[in-house]
Amino acid sequence: MNNLATVLITISLLTGGTETVNFDVPIHEAVSSSDVQVEYEIAESDINYLAKTLYGEARGIEPKMEKAAVCWCILNRVDSDEYNFKDMKTIKDVVTAPNQFMGYNKDNPLVDELVDIAEDVLIRWRMEKDGVMEVGRVLPTEYTYFYGDGDRNWFRTDWRSKEFWDWSWDNPYEEDLNG
């Protein structure tokens, strides 16, 4: 017996247009209709802060999942109760905090690919906050630290930790090679 139902969400974006997301949810969490309309207002400033940070921190990094993980790391700090992040309650607070995301620069260009990744992650984050399971998060919530060398990014739960995220979750950005 299939215990999943497919849910369709159409999201209106402040940057214009809509995005439709299909995902499977456990039946006990599914609504009676398989066609659900939910509108998420994603602030253009939040998209821009993330995209400009990605430009400075991860623009040469492949795969896309690692770029998305930088956004999730930032959002993890926004949501964190950890003392180190007590004054960081917005995306702007996190990326402009002294000695944190050094790649953020207000003059960094807005590159379409990075804007798309930032917008996608913000939509997934909002869906998660609304109780949607399995939104395609690529980094666990406890990972609030990262560093990169221009080729790869490494994420950890403590800035002194020698243990890094192992990329064991599914990659929602993986292209279907079969069609």
Enumerate the language-model features and the residues they cover.
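N-terminal export signals and maturation junctions of secreted/periplasmic proteins
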Residues: M1-I47
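Bacterial extracytoplasmic/cell-wall-associated proteins, especially those involved in peptidoglycan
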Residues: A30-V31, D35-G179
